[in-house]
Amino acid sequence: MGNDMIQVAGRPFSLESTTDFGRVERAILQQMLDSSEWFSYSSMNELRFELNVRINIMESAKEMNASQVTFTIFEHASCNPEYWTLTSTGGFLVRSDVRPSDAILDIYRNGTLYGFECATAIIIIYYQAILKSIGQLRFDSIFQHLYLYSWHTHPGLELHTFHADRFLPGDVVYFNNPDFHPDTPWFRGENAVVLSDGTFFGHGFGIMTAEQMIQSLNSYRFPGSMQPAYLANLITRISPLTIRNLLTLQSDRTTYHYSKAVIHHNLCSISSMDYQYYLLSLNG
């Protein structure tokens, strides 16, 4: 692999030619250059913006770990009624009289009032990271009528999920536990943010190594299981188009006048790929 794995404005990117990236940014760039994946950016600003979003995803994951939000199933979900309406399916609908940015920030500020499962946690982390990256004014203009439920996202946030053997800091991976105990189906897996030091944050488990995450899930298998939990080769990222749109579109051009379908599957801790299958079955 080499410099041609990253292209900026149609030209190969060289890490040696730049000196103004921070330590974490340079580490991410080096992993991108060493991968078999091809990354293309229309400008250096777009590359810098994606790196900033990745760093903010990791920071938002750490902040969630430090908050007092709890892991729970959809039936027992909870939220602050001053900012969100709790739906009968365990989703959170932002109130029309509050700013979406304030509602997201409240999850971190008043964590004891909130309980949700790990897929919802990832989406909250994404929104918090985007808020850090673009500021409250643009966030509130784009992300109106937020609804939090599993992997459901606002039209302004599209995700890209794919199979690969290598991941980058700021990616989301999935620890699969196919032989989960039927009494605790919410331990069927764990969605986790890849941190820059090689550890992972998973809502409900905290910050752990891959081995620790697997051991934790293994303790929730059914008796006699011969299939241990494992780190799947499944990666989820904010889509390149979303990154580009968040960087380039002006706030007065980014109001979305449509909503996306929601699948209220009532299954905690599913992967993004599984949620996409449910969406396809709905549309199929």
Swiss-Prot record:
It comes from the Bacteria. InterPro entries: Gln_gamma-glutamylTfrase_bac (IPR020916). Coiled coil: none annotated. It catalyses: L-glutaminyl-[protein] + L-lysyl-[protein] = [protein]-L-lysyl-N(6)-5-L-glutamyl-[protein] + NH4(+). GO terms for molecular function: protein-glutamine gamma-glutamyltransferase activity. The keyword Lipid biosynthesis does not apply. Its EC number is 2.3.2.13. Keywords: Acyltransferase, Sporulation, Transferase. GO terms for biological process: sporulation resulting in formation of a cellular spore. Probably plays a role in the assembly of the spore coat proteins by catalyzing epsilon-(gamma-glutamyl)lysine cross-links. HAMAP family: Tgl (MF_00727). NCBIfam families: PRK03187.1 (NF002869). This is Protein-glutamine gamma-glutamyltransferase. It comes from Halalkalibacterium halodurans (strain ATCC BAA-125 / DSM 18197 / FERM 7344 / JCM 9153 / C-125).
